[in-house]
Amino acid sequence: MKPWAAFHLIFLVASSLEGEVSNYGTRGAQDTEPTCRTEHQCTRDKIILQSQPGIPGIPGVPGTNGSEGLKGDPGPQGPPGIRGPDGIRGEAGPKGDKGDQGDKGDKGDKGDKGEDCNLDDCLPTEVRNCQDLLERGETLNGWYKIYPTEEVSMLVFCDMSTDGGGWLVFQRRQDGSVNFYREWESYKKGFGRQGSEFWLGNDKIHLLTNSGTQQLRIDLADFENIHTFATYSSFSIGNETEKYKLTLGSHLDGNMGDSLTLQNGRSFSTKDRDNDVSHIHCAVNFKGAWWYRKCHESNLNGLYHKGKHATYANGINWLTGKGYHYSYKYADMKIRPQKSETTVS
């Protein structure tokens, strides 16, 4: 046994130690029986000797890792953090689709009954034309409602500044924004835009020109802004059955000559109604709608060319003005009731 090894020696000592120690060596194995007779005696006679603990041994090799344990339950939710600063505002998103039309609203309550009156008293039948409006104090150019008859009202453009005012404009060309190469039905009802170009409508022109004698004035302006005009003592057209036949009085005055008298007595023609007396279809050949004969000396409903054009007589032409190869920038045709004395300018 190495000197640093731990050991225990237990000696059983008899209750009487005298002489026993010396005799121990002479006895045999059979003489080693203890002299104590009771467990108590033997126990209290034991002597236990213990040395100091030895040096710890070298650590063993680590064992292998055990298997991964089960996932624990989630911990409780923590308190909300402090709100951060607002971010930069993003760009506006694309416009959404148009929503469905809403439900129709409830019908309103019935209004109070108006006062009874005769038709002659209720309608301002004295406002039959632009001249009547001028005499009532209306001095601005613009659109007004008039009553050519007690049963009929219409919205018309009044020129209150040219040659004393009171002119009702039924045709205007100024920028080419409206197509004038149209069918019969369009010219019958009228077309165009209030703010630019329009034709009032042959049915309305017939009604207006058959309620008293109407003078006619035509104003033109070229692309150099040189203004010219022509006036006629009277102007009227027939109804649709008469194919809106033109009846024109004498040429009165102006600085662009007379290029309308040739059309006097002729029916109106459009690209789908050939009422001229030519072997060709004048409205189709000259891209307009007019009182064509064989075919024209004027074509104020022709194509909107910008000044000089190579094509023949299919623009806004006035023969005694700038001829068949020049299309005017501006043109209008207007009427007002005939006066006993007329001053033109």
From Swiss-Prot:
Domain Fibrinogen C-terminal span(s) in chain numbering: 121-339
One Pfam family, short name: Collagen
Disulfide bonds: 130-158, 282-295
Record bears the keyword Secreted: yes
Tissue: Expressed by the venom duct.
Region (Disordered) residue spans: 48-118
Residue ranges of every copy of the Collagen-like domain listed in the record: 57-114
Post-translational modification (record): Hydroxylated, possibly at Pro-80.
Entry's localization field: Secreted
Compositional bias (Basic and acidic residues): 86-116
PANTHER family in the record: FIBRINOGEN/TENASCIN/ANGIOPOEITIN, FICOLIN-3
Family membership noted in the UniProt record: Belongs to the ficolin lectin family. Veficolin subfamily.
Protein name: Ryncolin-4
Organism: Cerberus rynchops
